[in-house]
């Protein structure tokens, strides 16, 4: 049996649209074994127990590339990453599927080949890359090849995810984005993405509040998330370092100083006054990324 653990991820990190992402310590686990015949799923809803399951789709993509044909598969899923909340649940399934398939097939593909294949299936590297590598990454796709660099994050920072009880599909969140942008808005984001990376590198955490600003996606998507701006404003009142939409949303991610002990309690009290229910989860950066049979990929 192959056991694969994949972390949740938070993409964009404010201005780094489709290129910045960070792995955090929420996990999905996948237990996969080859059986004599059939396709058996455990740990997911009945509607996902078929060949359209994203984990199986990713596995088949890997098997086809390698030229391996399993006799049958049993796939058990232990999922802690909330679905359609902007925390990389689909990326985790894709990565988990591809990595487990590669292990079953004898490890024919190297890490670079696995990463490129996962991005081909998922479509964007911003979640897939940190899910593979752990930590924070800056990544691009160039002629179907994934190019990335790890972003050093200085000690002394943590994250807090505000996770609502409603979902938001990536398709719907992308549909509200404009077909084109103003040149000045592109410059706005380029500068703040550079500032974000530099501030995290150097521990200049007081600059994050400026670096979190964005003109490419957050304001368009905010209208799909009830009370986004009031929550953001309250987070800022509670001395957060920065607030941004996690991936396509609807989860709101907050950056905090490590020593901040009061934020979670205080923001939870505020969120309880709102219509929807919100879960508050303090998180750390996951530095390992994908783990296969208790070893780092």
UniProtKB/Swiss-Prot annotation:
<dbReference type="Pfam" id="PF08544">
    <property type="entry name" value="GHMP_kinases_C"/>
</dbReference>
<comment type="function">
    <text>Catalyzes the ATP-dependent phosphorylation of L-homoserine to L-homoserine phosphate.</text>
</comment>
<keyword id="KW-0547">Nucleotide-binding</keyword>
<dbReference type="InterPro" id="IPR013750">
    <property type="entry name" value="GHMP_kinase_C_dom"/>
</dbReference>
<dbReference type="GO" id="GO:0009088">
    <property type="term" value="P:threonine biosynthetic process"/>
</dbReference>
<keyword id="KW-0418">Kinase</keyword>
<dbReference type="InterPro" id="IPR020568">
    <property type="entry name" value="Ribosomal_Su5_D2-typ_SF"/>
</dbReference>
<dbReference type="InterPro" id="IPR006203">
    <property type="entry name" value="GHMP_knse_ATP-bd_CS"/>
</dbReference>
<keyword id="KW-0791">Threonine biosynthesis</keyword>
<feature type="binding site">
    <location>
        <begin position="82"/>
        <end position="92"/>
    </location>
    <ligand>
        <name>ATP</name>
    </ligand>
</feature>
<dbReference type="InterPro" id="IPR000870">
    <property type="entry name" value="Homoserine_kinase"/>
</dbReference>
<comment type="similarity">
    <text>Belongs to the GHMP kinase family. Homoserine kinase subfamily.</text>
</comment>
<dbReference type="Pfam" id="PF00288">
    <property type="entry name" value="GHMP_kinases_N"/>
</dbReference>
<dbReference type="GO" id="GO:0005737">
    <property type="term" value="C:cytoplasm"/>
</dbReference>
<keyword id="KW-0028">Amino-acid biosynthesis</keyword>
<comment type="pathway">
    <text>Amino-acid biosynthesis; L-threonine biosynthesis; L-threonine from L-aspartate: step 4/5.</text>
</comment>
<dbReference type="InterPro" id="IPR014721">
    <property type="entry name" value="Ribsml_uS5_D2-typ_fold_subgr"/>
</dbReference>
<dbReference type="InterPro" id="IPR036554">
    <property type="entry name" value="GHMP_kinase_C_sf"/>
</dbReference>
<protein>
    <recommendedName>
        <fullName>Homoserine kinase</fullName>
        <ecNumber>2.7.1.39</ecNumber>
    </recommendedName>
</protein>
<dbReference type="GO" id="GO:0004413">
    <property type="term" value="F:homoserine kinase activity"/>
</dbReference>
<keyword id="KW-0067">ATP-binding</keyword>
<keyword id="KW-0963">Cytoplasm</keyword>
<dbReference type="GO" id="GO:0005524">
    <property type="term" value="F:ATP binding"/>
</dbReference>
<keyword id="KW-0808">Transferase</keyword>
<dbReference type="InterPro" id="IPR006204">
    <property type="entry name" value="GHMP_kinase_N_dom"/>
</dbReference>
